[in-house]
UniProtKB/Swiss-Prot annotation:
Molecular functions per Gene Ontology: fructose-bisphosphate aldolase activity
Binding site residues for substrate: 50, 138
Protein name: Fructose-bisphosphate aldolase
Signal sequence residues: none
Annotated catalytic residues: 179 (proton acceptor), 221 (schiff-base intermediate with dihydroxyacetone-p)
Biological processes annotated in GO: glycolytic process
Pathway(s) of this molecule: Carbohydrate degradation; glycolysis; D-glyceraldehyde 3-phosphate and glycerone phosphate from D-glucose: step 4/4
Amino acid sequence: MMDCDHLLRLGMTAKKILENGKGILAADETPKTLGRRFEKLGITNTEENRRKFREILFSTKGIERYIGGVILNQETFEQTSGSGVPLTELLKKKGIEIGIKLDKGLIDYKEKEKISVGLEDLDLRCKSSAFKDATFAKWRSLFYFYDGIPSEDCINENCSILAKYAIICQKNGLVPIVEPEVFLEGDYSMKRSYEVTRQILSTLMKYLNYELVYIPGVLIKASYVTSGQLSNEKYTPKKVATFTLRALLSTIPCGIPGIVFLSGGHGSEDAIGFLNAINMERGCRTWSLSFSFARALTDGVLETWRGDDSNIEEAQKILLETSFKACRGAEGKLWDQE
């Protein structure tokens, strides 16, 4: 049983990450995933280049005005800056909360479906001194959309796993981010996306409560409700906002301190535009609505840097500008010039 002080710290950390419209930078890509992004731009996928890219992100002056938390990959906890300062220390000095990606990826579950794995040694990893600077964590499950998929069994299994991860994190003093991602690829309609998103989120809340997760000490990382990439259905930011907020209001209780959106294959302009439109919607809600973006924040940085140190200053300028826009979107003030 977690005592009141323990629960209070969890709740305060969750709120601090998203205070004043701040959001989360998802820098938790594996070396393999980051390597694919490097390859497209002619950057060699070495440990040194990955370290240097992360240092560019974390050392950007003023980034703490817009970013309240950064999710890291395990490799990053072992890396230092060019001057020998641990990369985690760069973030701590800016008052940015440090997160750790804890799922171990996905495995096959029935036909065309996946479940996330990593629970078997999660408690030990949460206790590891290697991650002593982390105050929050993230775990991702992925839902594919085909005929009859995701199945009810898959939804239940993934949501149960997310809830078990969440309670283990909380017992170890980490604020859990639970991420039930809806895969953007597919030809599904916005209506189907809305219906299944509601089913997933309501099931997630059921299991979080079943596992006795402290609701004010958890954050939800959600997908925007859109049609699939292969669908011919068109949508505007206003329509995305209406369907997404409706799904959230129907499923997420007031105790949740915040919901952050993943870009999930949407470009930076769309991802931030959707966030802004949602925050402009009227609705009786108590939770913060912000962002937890990876590529939407860093694609421009990577394209500008391209492994050339002479481009670092310009790359950091782009990160700052994009983060500022995302922060304005989290306040529903993207187009407010005042």
